[in-house]
Amino acid sequence: MVDVNRFKSMQITLASPNKVRSWSYGEVKKPETINYRTLKPEREGLFDEVIFGPTKDWECACGKYKRIRYKGIVCDRCGVEVTRAKVRRERMGHIELKAPVSHIWYFKGIPSRMGLTLDMSPRALEEVIYFAAYVVIDPKDTPLEHKSIMTEREYRERLREYGAGSFVAKMGAEAIQDLLKQVDLEAEIAVLKEELKTASGQKRIKAVRRLDVLDAFYKSGNKPEWMVLNILPVIPPDLRPMVQLDGGRFAASDLNDLYRRVINRNNRLARLLELNAPGIIVQNEKRMLQEAVDALIDNGRRGRPITGPGSRPLKSLSHMLKGKQGRFRQNLLGKRVDFSGRSVIAVGPTLKMYQCGVPREMAIELFKPFVMREIVARDIVQNVKAAKRLVERGDERIWDILEEVIKEHPVLLNRAPTLHRLGIQAFEPVLIDGKALRLHPLVCEAYNADFDGDQMAIHVPLSEEAQAEARILMLAAEHILNPKDGKPVVTPSQDMVLGNYYLTMEEAGREGEGMIFKDMDEAVMALRNGYVHLHTRVGIATDSLNKPWTEDQKHKILITTVGKILFNAIMPEELPYLQEPTNANLTEGVPAKYFLESGQDIKEVIEQLEINVPFKKKNLGNIIAEIFKRFRTTETSALLDRLKNLGYHHSTLAGLTVGIADIPVVEDKAEIIEESHKRVEQITKQFRRGMITDDERYNAVTAEWRAAREKLEKRLVANQDPKNPIVMMMDSGARGNISNFSQLAGMRGLMAAPNGRIMELPILSNFREGLSVLEMFFSTHGARKGMTDTALKTADSGYLTRRLVDVAQDVIIREDDCGTDRGLLITSITEGKEMIESLEERLNGRYTKKTVKHPETGAVIIGPNELITEDKAREIVNAGVEEVTIRSVFTCNTRHGVCRHCYGINLATGDAVEVGEAVGTIAAQSIGEPGTQLTMRTFHTGGVASNTDITQGLPRVQEIFEARNPKGEAVITEVKGEVTAIEEDASTRTKKVFVKGQTGEGEYVVPFTARMKVEVGDQVSRGAALTEGSIQPKHLLAVRDVLSVETYLLAEVQKVYRSQGVEIGDKHIEVMVRQMIRKVRVMDPGDTDLLMGTLMDITDFTDANRDVVISGGVPATARPVLMGITKASLETNSFLSAASFQETTRVLTDAAIRGKKDHLLGLKENVIIGKIIPAGTGMARYRNLEPQAVNEVEIIDEVTELPDGFETEENIVLK
């Protein structure tokens, strides 16, 4: 076998008859499989050992030669070669067909490749191939047309008319083969090229298609007649196995049945030909042979599929490749792996961030070879076999060895569905008792895991390199930030939030208020002895707290609470003391009002201070982000563990419980509802008098009930007790929100009916009072819809992710700087008055293209090609700059990928992205993973203002990425100028908008009901929307440039996600949109050898033009093409990637005719052939490094952690 890592590329072509013979080890002549008495394969049958190799290792069929020493000998009695049985997976046979047979892929595919080559309609081809008509192959001197079709009757009449032998006409695949042999590719191509210069319309389209196929044959060196088979390959027997079941019966692959039919019919045809049987019988047999081969290659493609027992269609060769269960997706892209296990997960609150608990039984099985090696190395037993027995017996000595083996050996934990790269992370295993894996509570959010019965899989990286990569790149403590937006993904949740919230609460007048302590120990002692409470406001000497105080603050008394002293004790010393949950406190330090001036009375000062709100979930997130920015991963993960421990400890001490009495009831609820009832009555009266329409009445009623619910909500918030446990949970962000609270204590409000329309009758009760039977019934609609929506959404979102990954999987950071001379001008994204994404957010982590100057002073804020940090972005925006030209993925010149400068920082690390980062896959995951959080609905605007549906949520994202015609499409102008008039035409129920510009004027018809975006006198640019709604990107591309379309698509995707509260970095969407617009269609080939109408990559097009321009020729012209992600995936240069995505047979048919080469640039194609992927450390530039010895002495600070959680530094000298 060739070493898979030595491949440069992989090519697929049509197989010539000689090629098939060269693969074959012998002809299969009989349809038999195995002898039912001896269970040995039959000679010359489908499982013959002479052809395919021995069934047992190193043993011939008759048993004369056994053992490896006879390797390579062919037995003189039975003719079987002595070799491994594994060759039965690779040796092929063949069947010599007694009549040529057309290959169904090339005849039946769309478009029919045979039809285009011969310039015949698929209908005519079918009649000829299946013996319903004759085709003229050589008219000789008769007036018959070449390739004309005639029925049996017409044929006989012509024979009578012109005489026998006066012309040649045949039927069946043989006729087609003769015609294909006659095709002169060069001449046909020349004729078509001439024809294209004048042709137009349908004729032109057909000529372009035909030219495409003929050119493919010509360039690839494939011969058209190879589309008709004279010899049929038989795949190796172990790929179509036959196994004995318990009851002595056999289960065999369907392929054996299909091959058997072919052989039977082929043998019968041979006999009929020998006997000189009548023509009609031979024809019938040939037709049946053709149908049998069709069924073998692609059963069900033509006519009714051949069925097996229980009328189940048999699985043909094509079906073996297709779909989720096919070869590509089931076996090549998704293999099962050894050294893995799965179990239920349980919480491990005592673990460190980088640890996970592995049950002993699991660990011993997973690390068995490592343990066995160590047992032998220690001379406990002499050989591996004995070591294996020792492990399987569960000897006492193995446990200590296991402990040592797993030390420093990371394992990978994965939870399905793996929606983004944080779904697989590495941990150091810790042995535990029990049978459940233990998971650190903070990584749950990344995995989206909870402990209600979730299961996780565990994998062991084996090689040293794999362990090193797992430890350096995948350790859970490294994954602090979410790759989609660069915000921390490991924020404390639930109990941890609640504990820290309770700890940092303040209360006026608690015991011991105004006490002053010299240091933290004293405060803690007072707390333990009951002199003060956690929430008591006290004073403490600032110099006892190791914090970055100013000179002025150093020797003062700080007013804080005991809880906050404990909270700050776990924070890094360099961080300011956190007294109030504000950004100013976090970045600049404690405000002056909390310090006691000399001579002031502490109690008076405390009374004047307002009560601070405690630290909530989002404040903790901000603290973590700030710490990450300052200290990076090691310190952050240590802090997270301390936050977790503190949170759990204090939520346990707080002992929050919820009882029914904790749900307050709003006093004046009855009055609020009574008022609303009266208003609804007034609205109904207005409707009855005909003052308003039914739609207006419906909108007014639902708005009234919404207002009532909001009023109740406001009352609840105003009257809530900050120490109420439900309020604390809600306010801290630990669990629940105001909507849940108001359903418990206010009113449930309006519900949706099964058809999605909001019902006018609201549910007036809340859960505290209890619902009536009718209300209960109403509320079940909503609950049921919620469940079905979630289920549908999950599937939709998963499929979207799959398509996104497929289209961008080969986008990798390939170089440092592409040297582009273009940039992208960006501003903030807005929708009307609403800010969608600010300029500051968009600038952060990108490189500038041009110098940015202060608009007033003209001072340079940042030079060209420099990284914009968070602080720089803030400085630019604060200076009043409104637009900046940055380096963007849209304008990157790198082939097959992106360069570092156009991409910017890697959001997952906060540092500049590295060469080799698979940014395409990360982008796809970042857009797909939040897909489940988006809504499914298409909103009705209530039928009053407009009659268009506005698509939002997941359907809108799919609409954008598939480049579909949007629902509620906006009318756009092709003219730049002024809107001169808007006329209404009552007869056609339309409006006409007139735009006049310097280049001409445009008249646009818009529906009567559409909402106008422009007024008379407005200035509009090309491609501007005249009405509300979504612009169709393909129309926009026709009137504007590529960059405008890309910018529009980016903004549209951001609008959907941001409106649902999901933040995604621009660069991820840029990567995706760029993949949709990579291709151009050739309009005029000029002097290049490109074909008109061909779809090709923009880089290949530029290369072809460059060569022609250098030699002084006329360059080709082309126009950009916007493709949806599904189409873009299928049009990729890699046939392996496209075939494993969708439409497998079509992709392979096309690739074979073109003799396509796959250069293995993407990730999928390398996974398929089992080669290391060309991203990260798999890139060629990293694989081909030569290690070199360096003799310098290097001093490294090693950080080790002591049992008390504090760290020491030792200097280690490396020789």
UniProtKB/Swiss-Prot annotation:
Gene Ontology terms, MF aspect: DNA binding; DNA-directed RNA polymerase activity; magnesium ion binding; zinc ion binding
Stored CDD domains: RNAP_beta'_C (cd02655), RNAP_beta'_N (cd01609)
Record bears the keyword Metal-binding: yes
Residues noted as binding Mg(2+) in the record, renumbered to the chain: 450, 452, 454
Coiled coil spans: none
Subunit and interaction comment: The RNAP catalytic core consists of 2 alpha, 1 beta, 1 beta' and 1 omega subunit. When a sigma factor is associated with the core the holoenzyme is formed, which can initiate transcription.
UniProt EC number: 2.7.7.6
Lineage: Bacteria, Bacillati, Bacillota, Bacilli, Lactobacillales
Protein name in UniProt: DNA-directed RNA polymerase subunit beta'
Organism (species): Streptococcus sanguinis (strain SK36)
GO biological process, one term: DNA-templated transcription
Amino-acid positions noted as binding Zn(2+) 1 in the UniProt annotation, renumbered to this chain: 60, 62, 75, 78
Major enzyme class: transferase
UniProt xrefs under SUPFAM superfamilies: beta and beta-prime subunits of DNA dependent RNA-polymerase
Superkingdom in the source lineage: Bacteria
Protein's job: DNA-dependent RNA polymerase catalyzes the transcription of DNA into RNA using the four ribonucleoside triphosphates as substrates.
Similarity-based family: Belongs to the RNA polymerase beta' chain family.
